[in-house]
Amino acid sequence: MKGILKIAFKLLVNDKGKYAALLVGITFAVFLMVQMISIFSGILIKSSSTVINLGADMWVMDPAVNNVASSIPLPDYVLDAVRSIEGVNYAVPLYSGAALVKLRNGIFQPVTILGLDDHSLFGRPELIEGEIEDIYAENAFIVVQDAEVRKLGHPTVGTEFELNDHRGVIVGIAKVGASGLFGLPTLYTTYSKAIQYIPSPRFTISYILVEPKSPEAVTHIESEVRRLGYLALTKDEFMEKIANFYKYQTGLGTNILIMTAVSFLVGLSISGQTFYTFILENLEKFGALKAIGAKGRELIYMILFQAAFTALVGYGLGVGLCVLIIVLAKIRVPEYSATVTFTTLAFAFVMVLIIAAISSYIGIRKVLKIEPFDIFRG
Amino acid sequence: MDTAISAKELTKWFGEGDLRTYAVKEVSFDAYFGEILFVVGPSGSGKTTLLSMISGILRPDSGTVNVDHVDIWSLTPDQIAEFRLNKVGFVFQDYHLFPRLTTAENVAIPLILKKKDWNESIRDAEHYLDVVGLKNKAQLAPVKLSGGEQQRVAIARALVAQPDLLIFDEPTASLDGDTGRRIMEFVKNRILNDSRCILIVTHDSRIFEYADRIMRMEDGKTVGIEKRADH
């Protein structure tokens, strides 16, 4: 079998024009599919960045919340009620909101403010400069070193700014796992300072972060919170809710889906058509092989090998090209959101296999129909 | 001489009902090891259809074909493919060489189909290219060869698996007179042996002198088999 596959390989790659056209079709399709889905994955990860960075196992929120940036304040009694639920190890308040800071050069810059529980600082980021205790100092804020920090003029420890006529000072620089979707720099402070500095409605708790005593307690906590008229979600459930919002309620997911389908069809039509032409041009040769003594299944193996080989090379080139462009884009535009996930790679791989299967199916049908007698007859 | 091929009452038709046309009708003949048998006749007389049935390519509607005492049409499709691979060598009218493979790789195809090691197959192919006088062209693409050279590559491919039965379809149709005669000299003197039977379908009366016997066909029937006086 190895020998006949080698013949198939040589027939394929020695026909440089056709082979290049086949590769271009599949590479293009894979590139577009992976690129589209990676951009969407990047957006989804960024949209859940607060949830990822704070790391709480459970989040309590108003049932109308559909993404982490649009919190609906909770009454203080909900915090007490959640703390009293059996199975809750601890529960802390979180302030999450937006504000305008005035920089020393007079420019106003919108920022995201996260106010951590004063007692536990639960969800605090990892500091790369400064000490976490300094967050309790007067006017203290910790800035996140991400793609957006340059919008604050690349602050260092000691940099001052104004926030609603309050003086603010950077006491630490932190790093986090994911930066936000909306291109805003992030400042951490304590919960009490956040509600003091930022004009707030009657209720000030954006979310309650919960640590259950055990994984088994999660269901009970969720049902008890539901009885209070609120919603408790695990970290994964909350991220899924946010993802669903962007997928189904913003039109973004539908557009990406359409673009992915179009990419698939473009790739299928280019490579399918080229492969079909390749088979047609070699049809007499396949017939001659049959006449010489090749069995039908050997010809099928040859065609499947050619299709699979082209698909795999095209897949590799497409993924490589996509990663290269994402890397280059991130160098030029740091906040560019695109993430190649294993799920995306697996999806594109399945799609490319489908392209190869459909293309080879057409070829196989043709080759199996050719009769050696037709070759003999000329 | 031993009987290589024994065809009995071979019939093949195409179409059904009023449209049924007989390509070959009740043809019987024997061919022997060590002889060159020409099948001649006008276009549409059934020569190619007859050879296709004898070589395991086209199933007859009735009649039997015994090759080396085996009724080939009682075999399964896979066994018939094996039969063609092991017992029959074809030289097609248009050669059907693969332009994307080297000359040696083209010749090695039957051995590769027989699952022989690639390198060994290429070595054997080069030996047969040497036999047909083309060893120095082994690494060239067939398109770089002349018509006569391509014909010899096709002959080397037909020979490489050492078949008992060699079938040539119009071997000189696209060659000039001199080249055609040289090819036939080569077939007669170097290819034919006592354990091989060669069947040649041709229109070309210039090469009839190389036949041991000539079978004439008209309208799907045999109209006579003549033995050449000088053979």
Please provide the spans of the model-predicted regions.
Chain B
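ABC-family P-loop ATPase nucleotide-binding domain
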Residues: 1-13, 224-231
